[in-house]
From Swiss-Prot:
Protein name as annotated: Tyrosine--tRNA ligase
PROSITE patterns, per database record: AA_TRNA_LIGASE_I (PS00178), S4 (PS50889)
Location (main, coarse): cytoplasm
The enzyme's E.C. designation: 6.1.1.1
SUPFAM superfamilies, alphabetized: Alpha-L RNA-binding motif, Nucleotidylyl transferase
Organism: Salmonella enteritidis PT4 (strain P125109)
Domain S4 RNA-binding: 357-414
Length: 424
């Protein structure tokens, strides 16, 4: 992405929700490398899909020659951002937040290049400047620059202020000052001139721009990326099991890959623009090809492949594709023990059973059939496989050969109903 028309290119991808003084920012970016930052608060022990668009945006700026600063909020994570939240967040302990800071820092690192000369990325933690600040300094040096009148008129907190049942604590109300000071601080420390974030962060970003101007007399900018929505109106980045996480221990690479494979046709080309580094021309050509092929679209496979590789690397992608292929074909011989661990984690429904169980009981325990009677009929009708092999004997009792790697047996009823038995 050439720097001179970077904003235009981001707009073509649908990646710009709001931007302050667009012409001045475009001019500033055209003059040479700019330091920019995005903040990630440790509200859990992993980032999730909602964080991916701003994180990839940092990467897009770095690829265009700019210097990204990834800020993990060791201090702001202790307070909690009230922006567009219906209720007060639960406060986490300092130990928990510090632990999460370390994990999120590690997660962010592979997306950016920390060793590429002039525009090498920087990792920052706002606990470094807030941890030792006393309350008088905070109120005198930061608080006096903020107008409460303006703060209560910010859209992000308006809904909370108007609700009798919830309201907002002084703790969360002060969050805006903390994030505002982050921008001013990073401007002084690293010359940061641009903050990016999700569109829910607009109020916090504009506060930071204002504070930086007041404290350092510098012009700085803000740009937000849209919060991702799906064409059908349902929430993006959620499955029945909850959020889709970037940590493979919380969402396996197989489940992650499947999430993208299941993208609706109405969303997939937009998501290719948001979540991949493919050229717009390439994405448009793929859309055209899918429209005219008369076959199932290829776009979902391209999207799943690109994003899984970005987040889980080549190894994670290869494993996810291998598991997908084996489940589709019914032949499990290529699956490794680690693949079965992914399936047990969240890939297919899982049930633990004692050795000596029979097939009918397994189908009932696995919720593949409601009763032993129904299970008997299903087995007799040749609709059940054990590890890919058909089994039509209703009295069948599992043996050691059925226990792959000593503990896994994959049951299938019909074409698509799976359950993994983990033997105790």
């Amino acid at each position: 992405m050439a720097s001179s028309n970077l904003i235009k290119q981001l707009q073509e991808r649908g990646l710009v929700a709001q931007v302050t003084d667009e012409d001045a920012l475009a001019e500033r970016l055209a003059q040479g490398p700019v330091a920019l930052y995005c903040g990630f608060d440790p509200t859990a022990d992993s980032l999730h899909l909602g964080h991916l668009v701003p994180l990839l945006c940092l990467k897009r700026f770095q690829q265009a020659g700019h210097k990204p600063v990834a800020l993990v909020g060791g201090a702001t994570g202790l307070i909690g951002d009230p922006s567009f939240k219906a209720a007060e967040r639960k406060l986490n302990t300092e130990e928990t937040v510090q632990e999460w800071v370390a994990k999120i820092r590690k997660q962010v690192a592979p997306f950016l290049d920390f060793d590429c000369g002039e525009n090498s990325a920087i990792a920052a933690n706002n606990y470094d400047w807030f941890g030792s600040m006393n309350v008088l300094t905070f109120l005198r040096d930061i608080g006096k620059h903020f107008s409460v009148n303006q703060m209560i008129n910010k859209e992000a907190v308006k809904q909370r202020l108007n609700r009798d049942d919830q309201g907002i604590s002084f703790t969360e109300f002060s969050y805006n000052l903390l994030q505002g000071y982050d921008f001013a601080c990073l401007n002084k420390l690293h010359g940061v001139a641009l903050q990016i974030g999700g569109s829910d962060q607009w109020g916090n970003i504009t506060s930071g721009i204002d504070l930086t101007r007041r404290l350092h007399q510098n012009q700085v900018f803000g740009l937000t990326v849209p919060l991702i929505t799906k064409a059908d109106g349902t929430k993006f980045g959620k499955t029945e099991g909850g959020a889709v996480w970037l940590d493979p221990k919380k969402t396996s690479p197989y489940k992650f890959y499947q999430f993208w494979i299941n993208t609706a046709d109405a969303d997939v080309y937009r998501f290719l623009k948001f979540f991949t580094f493919m050229d717009i021309e390439e994405i448009n050509a793929l859309e055209e090809e899918d429209k005219n092929s008369g076959k199932a679209p290829r776009a979902q496979y391209v999207l799943a492949e690109q994003v899984t590789r970005l987040v889980h690397g080549e190894e994670g992608l290869v494993a996810a594709k291998r598991i997908t292929e084996c489940l589709f074909s019914g032949s499990l011989s290529a699956l490794s023990e680690a693949d079965f661990e992914q399936l047990a984690q969240d890939g297919v429904p899982m049930v633990e059973m004692e050795k000596g169980a029979d097939l009918m009981q397994a189908l009932v325990d696995a919720e593949l059939q409601p009763s032993r009677g129904q299970a008997r009929k299903t087995i007799a009708s040749n609709a059940v496989t054990i590890n890919g092999e058909k089994q039509s004997d209703p009295e069948y009792i599992f043996n050691d050969e059925d226990r792959l790697f000593g503990r896994y047996t994959l049951l299938r009823r019909g074409k698509k109903n799976y359950c993994l038995i983990c033997w105790k």
